[in-house]
Amino acid sequence: MIRVAGLRKTYGGFPAVVGSDFEVSEGEIFGVVGPNGAGKTTTLKTLAGLIEPTEGTVEIGAYDAGDAEMRRHLGFLPEESPLYEDMTARSYLRFFADLYDVPREEATRRTEDTLDRLELEHRDRRLGDMSKGMKRKVAIARSLVNDPDLLIYDEPASGLDPLTTNYVLEFTRELAERGKTVVFSAHNLYHVESVCDRVVIMNRGEIVARGTVPEIREEHGETTYRVFATVPVEGSEATDDGRYLRTVGDMAAVEAVRVEAEFAGGGVADIRTDEPSLEDVFLDIAGRPPAAREDGRGRADSAAAARADGGREGERTDSGDDRGTW
């Protein structure tokens, strides 16, 4: 569905994305995560055809990113998605359906079907009078008005209450089950972990980890073991229930604690395994210095990279209040 090769984007000499390569399969939810300035937004906007890459290729199906025909098969939901607030939800979605030349009868059917699935009430209320959660549902509905094959969602549940957040995540899973391909980015890694089939972690413009969440945790995370002894052992801390806790990093150390406890006349009452979360791995990776670059072109500092990731150079925008959206 998506093939990205050697993607590089620079702003004023500063690299926002450095030589990214990845593929996204049809019907997959593909996560793109990283700290501020990592290159996530630049990557998503390049996929959406809003930014021209400095180098590299981005192919989406049979099209290059940015091709007019490709846009007819794409739905893009940016993190900030201003709406035409004097319109109602119905009139707003029909307006965008007209932009895609969707026949009026089909546009009405799609509008009502999507609003039904999103459980959006008050469809004839002004958008400016709606809550943030309702507005986000309308923005999601807009991304679907042309029945796209590919959806690019940047922070789809940002700032929403827990109930609406869970609904948006469930709806995203439903889209993939219906055969849609979704590229999904969020700072809340629980959202990513709960919906994404595969993930790439970016740091300072580079992809530094990739795979399924279990694969990333296994390759980059560290499993720890909490050993509860019945007697004090070296490095242990007393617990409220009268046991002594020692946290170690491998089974050899677990066995060493057992031997020490038994030698002291006690034993091990319990062993608990703590698997790393995606957030644990992310925090570890985001704190590492970037790998040495082979091309010798240098590295922007983190502040410059952050500015670049939200940069303006080469960005295509629509007119009106829906800048950068379709």
Predicted regions and their residues:
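Catalytic Walker B motif of ABC-type/P-loop ATPase nucleotide-binding domains
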Residues: 151-155
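Conserved catalytic motifs of ABC-family nucleotide-binding domains
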Residues: 147
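Conserved ABC ATPase "signature" region
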Residues: 94, 98, 105-122
